[in-house]
Amino acid sequence: MTISFHHHFREGDYVFNIIMRSIIDHGYKNLTLAPSSLTNVMNDIVVEAIKKGVVTGITSSGMRGSLGDAVSHGILKNPVIFRSHGNRARAIESGDIKIDVAFLGVPNTDDMGNANGMDGVAAFGSLGYALIDAQYANTLVLITDNIKPYPNTPASIKQTQVDYIVQINEVGNPDKIGSGATRFTKDPKELKIAKMVNDVIVNSDYFKNDFSFQTGSGGAALAVTRFLRTTMIDKNIKAAFALGGITKPTVDLLNEGLVAKVMDVQDFDKGAAESMKDNPYQQEIDASWYADPANKGAMVDKLDVAILSALEIDTKFNVNVMSGSDGIIRGAIGGHQDAATAKLTIISAPLVRGRIATIVPEVTTVITPGDSIDVIVTEVGIAINPKRQDLMAQLKNVPGLPLYTIEALQEKAEKIVGTPKPLQFTDRVVAVAEYRDGTLIDVIKQVKE
Amino acid sequence: MEIKKTAIAGTLESSDVQIMLTQGTDGIVFDLVSDVVKQFDEAIKKTINQVLSEYDVQNVIVKVVDKGALDMVIKARTVAVVQRALDIVDEPKWEVL
């Protein structure tokens, strides 16, 4: 039996623990857990459920902390399957994931199940990832702390899909759902990287009226949005849409008229979550619409520029966002593989983090293939995928944008940190990573004690 | 050279290393904790051993708490802690530096 949850409450989630506690206490066994992702607040109870034989299989975007550590040490019977957000939608639509019961927490619903994520104490904005579960689960249970008068609109989840509604005291902790006001980073390294990312974008042929972009939620990504704003005003360029996980600085661009539409699959901060209900141009999209490679057309197919992060990048431009430098699972695919199909995919990352090189001869785990990566931006300079000679021509003479080969950046990193010993793994596979089309891209093995 | 007193150098900040030397009788004995132990345990010991041998320290207990320090940081902290442990902070051994 397969059960699912969404992770829109992120670190403020109460629903997951309440439901899992009840499932464990009722003595269920051999369940497959298929949430959109797993946050730290879910770790302890998942580890307990695995130890008691309640959960024997997991498919997720990612995992981290004590759960990632336990899985990397071989606690789970079956290998975890990691899927991107677009791939999860594909897998559910195609029947690769068959959800028996979806338990979806919502900050409001009426007594028939018309619900959205935009309003209420525990509002988180877009219900993007959960909408797939709502549409395809055999049985759908909504859990809420806020029953509204019938009929409740806008209805992101509709009464036609809902079997049960359960009222509890609190579905989430609003202070931990999204980060508060996002501050402009003061880290000089992040600022330098962000400025160079901006230089790459605005000096490429993609920077023209009606372009589109996706940024992440990290410090550098937020700073890129600010730099991009200034350049868009200076050059009088407006974007057709911003896509993906949305932050307040992106909503600000919408309100200033610099971006025509925000296509919103999740909201990373309060500002973005709260503005959705008042802004018809901040459009909620589900994970399939966002990024499913097997439906009749996903938004990422129209995406011009994507700015993504990385734990490791290798000299073949492959990216790892899943396993740490110690080989232990500590990340999530998220929309990485999906957004990386953009026409200009930029990875922004520091050359080294502490004594760990970011650019390495070979990544520990391949998550996003090098063929979909176009430019790497570090604080010392950029590297362009040699398959993109067109970008090479556009970017080779930009002041303040030193161009290196990826091999030269790798050597620079190794010179700073030294040569690490190779990691030791056993032969047992503890997790498999799929590419967004459902094919196998890499496996993660159990770490040696 | 003999360790004259227990000494410590460095902090527990990210990218730093804290090294403590105490008197030993059984060669150079390491107690190493590191965020990057899987990749760099031998590299860290090699750097510290090199500095110890330049000061001709043969019997010592070396407690290392490493927070991902780069090699040059480890070397600098080791020089500092050895000078303190040998009670020669006023007479730096310039040829080692």
Stretches found by the model and what they are:
Chain B
Residues 1-97:
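N-terminal intrinsically disordered, cationic/polar leader segments
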